[in-house]
Amino acid sequence: MDGIVLDGAALGSTAIGFFLFAAFVGGFASGLAGFAMGFVVSGIWLHFLTPLQTTTLVVGYGLLTQGYGVWKLRQTLAWRSIAPFIIGGAVGVPIGTLLLTYIDPAYLRSGVGLLLVIYGSYGLAQPKLKPVPGSVGADTGIGLANGVLAGLTGLPGFIITIWCQLRGWPKDAQRAVFQPVMLAAIVMNVIALSIAGAMTAATMQLYLLGLPAMVAGLWVGFKLYGKLDDAAFRKVILVLLLIAGLGLIAPRGW
């Protein structure tokens, strides 16, 4: 177990244990809510992995978790409704990547975190809001904003997740929209990371090591998801958004 070497240092059995634990919990969060896997695992992995290694693993596992989620919900997918978000995201991701040269992502993450904390806290304290009407133009704009944020911070799901919740859709309808949109953004990131040479042999070894734990957590999360009604799912989303917001605001000590 100590044979995995990253940047010249071997991971000990304790670090590998935490790595596998985070993979399971991250898979569980993705199976239960359809997002938040990256925040769950990053909070642990960044203690012994570099940001690039963590990002590469999160994107790789995201391809699995979101792909599996889309496949599980394939009967409810409405591509005509999804298309405006993906088109907007395809434009937004490169814009966000370009803006990285001019904007400090750390400040942006803190700002996004504050908004998530406010939204999550308000949603948990208040009754369900009246559904917001949508349109193709609005959906494309949300996709654009979601793509810009994904390009800037690597966070492909928050704006689209909140929008789907504000629309007042049932839980399956929400996931049938925001998971394909997130999957499309992740595919773009996989291509970019592959071109950048981030997919090293050691990182792939770690990916394969954590794969069974991630799959197990994903399966358990989906099983529990099937037992949630729309009201309970809404609370799960709000709690995860609140936790994610706090995680973005909290100082990083690694």
Question: What kind of region is each of these model predictions?
Answer:
Residues 54, 95-100, 109, 149-155, ...:
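Hydrophobic alpha-helical transmembrane segments in multi-pass integral membrane proteins
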Residues 16, 59, 112-116, 120, ...:
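Residues within membrane-spanning alpha-helices of integral membrane proteins
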Residues 4, 14-83, 143, 147, ...:
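Small-residue-rich hydrophobic segments that form or flank transmembrane alpha-helices
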Residues 78-89, 110-113, 133-143, 173-180, ...:
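Cytoplasmic-side transmembrane-helix entry/capping segments in multi-pass membrane proteins
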Residues 66-74, 111-135, 222-223, 228, ...:
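Transmembrane helix exit motif
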Residues 53-125:
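Membrane helix-loop-helix hairpins that form the core translocation module of multi-pass transporters
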Residues 38, 50, 104, 108, ...:
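A helix-boundary/kink motif common to multi-pass secondary transporters
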Residues 1-14, 254:
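Short, strongly hydrophobic alpha-helical membrane anchors
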